[in-house]
Every structure is written in structure tokens, then in C-alpha cells.
Amino acid sequence: MCTCTLSLSLCVCLSDLGSPSLQGEGMARWQALESSPEVLSSLARALTSDERWRVHDVWGLDDDLLAMCVDETSCRCAALVLLFPSKAGRPVRATTDEEKKRTEGMYFLRQDRGRLENACGTIAVCHALANVDAVNPLEATSRLGEFVAATRAETPTERGAALDKSDAVHDVHAELVVQGQSEVLESARVAHHFASFVERDGAVVELDGAYNDGPAVVGEVQDGRSFLQAAAGVIMKKYLEPSAGAIDFSVLALVYDHAPVHRS
């Protein structure tokens, strides 16, 4: 298997270098969120009211490095989150009828590239947490549980608009921006975007509210392979191999601890 070691420098989600948050022409409602495991772990826990959620760096995508980064004897990998360079003018991919059948019932929202341009990290985590009932169902009274229930009957575009107006989700995002923000925001000059990958009935599904119009089936979990291994293979083939050795990618694993977490 081809070995890939990732460069996991701290990055932020900036889908447009003309963002008001960078130009000083007024502060956008959603500010850039750091991609550190600490920040995203805090985000997942706050959205779900569950301390067992954690986010890990993934340092490489071959089996040995995956096993070092995510010990699935003590936790279960629910999703991989990819941070990758975004491209201006990239078209939105339309999902096929077959994909719609295979992903029926999955929760998906569209990301407005204007108002929600810097919310892609939070959207990726929300997408992951809302679609991993097989790992751990959302608590109905949690911030995200209530938001998903309230918007379940809406279209993906309507859900995106509702997220923009949701104080329950935005307040968590804003608090973590303040806690995590440093000189990174000022020094960041490369646009990046987040997408998440989850399993649905043996399929690896990509959830990207900016560049897909619905859940996209991008791979299969073959017999004898784990979701973690299958999703890592998809990321390698779809994103890293075509990039010809570019290093500005980050992969993180969203995991759920088997045992309760006790914090002092």
C-alpha cells in the first residue's frame, strides 16, 4: 500500500480570500474556526452534550499509521474530516439517483458560500454527528439534536439558512473561535474547506455542503476492511494522489470512546 504522511499544520476554513473577516470591511457572523483537534473536540462535545466524543489528528493514511492514530479497541471511528484547498469557481456536484436511494434519510444541509463561508468546519462536524446513529445516536435535547429535529422536514438549502440563524449552534462556534484564534487567522493566506466522510450501509459517504448538492457515495467498505481504512483510501485516491504531493491537507478522525470519560 502506498504510504502517505500528512502535513497537519493548523489551518482555518476560508472559502474566499475576499472574506470581510480578512479585509476588515465588517465582521461576518461566522468567523474562521481553527482545525485543531482540541477545538473540534470541544465543538463535538458542546453540540452533543456528550463528553465521549473526541477528534484525533490522522498522521497518515496507510493501515499502520491509522492504527497508531486511532485505537479502535478503546473507541470507534465515526467519521473522517478532511481539510483541503478549495478552488474558486469549483462547480457543485449533482448526486445521482442511485446515490439518493442509498443515502435516503441522511441529514444534509447546503452551505451558502456567502453567509456561511467560514462555517464549513462546524458544518462538517454537524454533518458527521447527525449521521452516525450506528455509533451513537444524537441526544434529543442537545443543541445539535434539537436543531436537526427542528429542520428534518426542510430542504438542504432551507437547513443551511436555518443554521445561519441558529444561535444555539452559532454561540458554540463563536466561543471556540475566540478560544482558539491566534495569529493563525492573520497569517492564513490559502483558502481551505472541510468535508466529512461517514459510513452508510457499507458505503463511504462524503458530506460536503458547499460542493455537493447531497450526500455523495464515494467508496465501499469491503469485507475485512474497516470504515476507517475504507474512508482513508477514498481520501487518498480522490484528493491526495491527484494533488501530486501537495502537503496542505489535513485529516482528522471523529471518534467515540467506549468507556465514560471522567474529567476533573
Model-inferred region functions:
Residues 1-14:
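Intrinsically disordered, low-complexity terminal segments enriched in Ser/Thr
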